Amino acid sequence: MDQAEFEKIIEHTRKSRKYRELILPEETLQDMLTAEAALGGSKAEVIQRFRKKLHNVIAPYLENIDYAQETERMKACFQVNPTPDQVKAWALSVMQKHASTRERLPNIEAFCQCLHGHISTPDRILDLACALDPLLLPWLDFPNETEFLAYDIHQPRVDFLNAFFARAYPSAHAIQQDILVNPPAQPADCAFFFKEAHRFEKRSPGCNRSFFQALP
């Protein structure tokens, strides 16, 4: 397939009913389609493999969270100058809607205490493939000057997190970036990579070692 065909497939995928609300990075689709095309076969076979791999990798993002609605709920919460406990209650209500994040909620206090005990107060943290992990910040209680950079490929989620950061964590930023294709260039004292290595392996077997080595 030539580049024009690649672009047509990518554009069709981004606009499909299944994926359009995610606003996936073009670099993600280009990387996955290129990898499948390199394996050979007919155009139909390449597209079939691409769609299957894309579903396996992206399926966890196909959640039932209305991030525009959650942003409005968050704004309402912060309009009344909430207490720390009220912020935590709001964060829990959102994390409960995300399958992967929900699994750690019964142990959230112990998890955050253990995590904080290991990393103390780093100057900069990278949260790689963050999902809703940044909503743990009210429990981690880092200093205001701690820089927290959260990376995800789901644009509506990134926008939601940035709205949250703007109201509560001015040194935090969410970035839409495919970290496997384009690893973060910023050096950091600590990086979170929660429950994502297996999905990287599904996408590109054996990639985790080179990914970790690419981090500054």
Language-model features and meaning:
Residues Y169-L180:
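Conserved SAM-binding strand-loop segment of SAM-dependent methyltransferases
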Residues A37-H118:
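Conserved Class I S-adenosyl-L-methionine-dependent methyltransferase catalytic core
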Residues T121-D133:
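Conserved class I S-adenosyl-L-methionine
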Residues L132-N144:
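Conserved SAM-binding loop of SAM-dependent methyltransferases across substrates and taxa
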Residues E147-D152:
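Conserved SAM-binding motif I beta-strand of class I
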Residues H154-P156:
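Conserved SAM/SAH-binding beta-strand->alpha-helix loop
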Residues L161-N162:
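Conserved SAM-binding loop
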Residues L137, A188-S204:
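A short SAM/SAH-binding and catalytic strip from SAM-dependent methyltransferases
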